[in-house]
Design a protein with these regions (language model features):
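Alpha-helical transmembrane-bundle signature of multi-pass membrane transport and export proteins
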Residues: 1-422
Length: 422
């Protein structure tokens, strides 16, 4: 039994064991993502404390995610022109400066809502370039064979931090204020930057280089044309767009579900958020262990995620809703990590940044539209209607993609090599 557990753990963390550069990156991300989630909680709390307005918190979310809506497509073109390793060093350094700035403002006691909005918008703008660059760097660190494993581990780090970061942030806010959370986040970037600077660029996976497009417009046109004509990538982008738009609006739905539908308080809201995060973490680790991405598995993941939301719609039991959110988290990372892997594996080296940019537009750039739509549906028919519409939309697109996947030539890598327990 012990040997089997060791073999399973070795396979799950294969990219960490096998690639020194990725091991440094992974360690830094574990620390930095916790700081990032602490900052998100602290920003929302600070704005709410200053304004006493939920609408003001909504504006904060708009500032954070609008850059993805506006600039994700162009960012992908820019990423293809840059060195991913140097770009990530620059974007992480800029985020550390921004976190330090809001920390100083908050600790000095002079923070105003517009300060938080500006920092959040600038942080979002930097992350538009940082996110596809980190994906590009992940490919360079591990290569195509271990890419599904590494992407799943990245997702696991993000969702693990999603559990612990807000909890730790809440404790620090209560004990010392939001400014300390910002300072801790700023300090967390030291771990990332140290890992990046310790990497050996000569060990990066080689990629094909081609002449740059004459203009950003030409480069974007090339990426969109390739995505439109490559059926596997087109299917993944269509699925991502629909599921992200309809099913990923928990920031709007969960507070309303807890307060108005279940007539509960912040404790229930925290519980529901946490169980989804736990499920997402487990799903990421399972995906990392499997280390193989397929269109069919991706469609099953999105269908399971959508089905959980559909089943939540009529429920009034906190226990059952928590169970479905946990399962939804497992299916969520099964879908998201597989879809990202498939797009990158199918992408030519010279177009990978552009296709990742298009993916991030479909995944994160639709948050503004989805949030507005969920708010409208909730006002019209409560969370019951919002969850029902999300479930039906996600299931319908998942079924279409699954049926198409039976005729699509897959671009899949063989599973990562089998490990023998040490």
């Amino acid at each position: 039994m012990t040997a089997a557990i060791l073999r399973a753990g070795a396979r799950t963390f294969l990219s960490v064991r096998k690639h020194r550069n990725y091991r440094l990156f992974f360690t830094g991300q574990v620390i930095s993502n916790i700081g990032t989630w602490m900052q998100r909680v602290a920003q929302a709390w600070l704005v709410l404390s200053l304004t006493h307005s939920p609408f003001a918190v909504g504006i904060l979310a708009l500032c954070q995610f609008m850059p993805f809506t506006l600039f994700s497509l162009i960012a992908g073109v820019v990423v293809d022109r840059l060195n991913a390793w140097r770009t990530v060093i620059g974007t992480q350094l800029m985020q550390m400066v921004l976190a330090s700035t809001i920390a100083v403002i908050a600790l000095a006691g002079v923070a105003r809502p517009w300060h938080v909005y500006v920092i959040a918008a600038l942080m979002g703008l930097v992350q538009v370039l940082d996110a596809p660059s980190r994906q590009q760097l992940t490919f360079r660190m591990v290569g195509p064979l271990e890419l599904p494993n590494a992407i799943s581990l990245n997702s696991g780090v993000f969702n693990g931090a999603r559990i612990f970061g807000p909890a730790l942030g809440g404790v620090i806010i209560a004990a010392a204020g939001a400014g300390v959370c910002f300072a801790v986040n700023a300090a967390s970037y030291i771990a990332v930057l140290a890992g990046l600077l310790m990497m050996r660029p000569q060990e990066f996976h080689a990629v094909e280089r081609r002449a740059r497009p004459r203009t950003l417009y030409v480069g974007l046109k090339e990426g969109i044309s390739f995505a439109r004509n490559h059926e596997q990538i087109r299917l993944m982008l269509m699925l991502t767009f629909v599921v992200s738009t309809f099913c990923l609006n928990f920031n709007v739905l969960l507070p309303v579900l807890a307060k108005h539908t279940l007539h509960s308080g912040p404790q229930v809201f925290g519980l529901l958020s946490a169980v989804f995060g736990v499920g997402a973490l487990i799903g990421a680790l399972v995906s990392a262990h499997v280390s193989r991405a397929t269109v069919g598995t991706t469609a099953v993941g999105s269908a399971g995620f959508a089905l959980c939301e559909l089943l939540i719609s009529p429920l009034r039991s906190i226990a059952l809703i928590a169970l479905l959110l946990f399962l939804g988290g497992v299916f969520f990372t099964t879908w998201s990590s597989n879809s990202s892997s498939l797009i990158q594996l199918a992408a030519p080296d010279h177009l990978r940044g552009r296709l990742i940019g298009i993916y991030f537009f479909a995944f994160a750039g639709t948050g503004t539209l989805g949030g507005i739509m969920s708010g409208w549906l909730t006002a019209l028919g409560g969370t019951e209607l919002s969850f029902a519409v999300a479930g039906v939309a996600g299931l319908s697109m998942s079924l279409y993609v699954w049926l198409r996947s039976r005729t699509v030539p897959l671009v899949e890598e063989r599973p990562a090599e089998e490990l023998i327990a040490a």
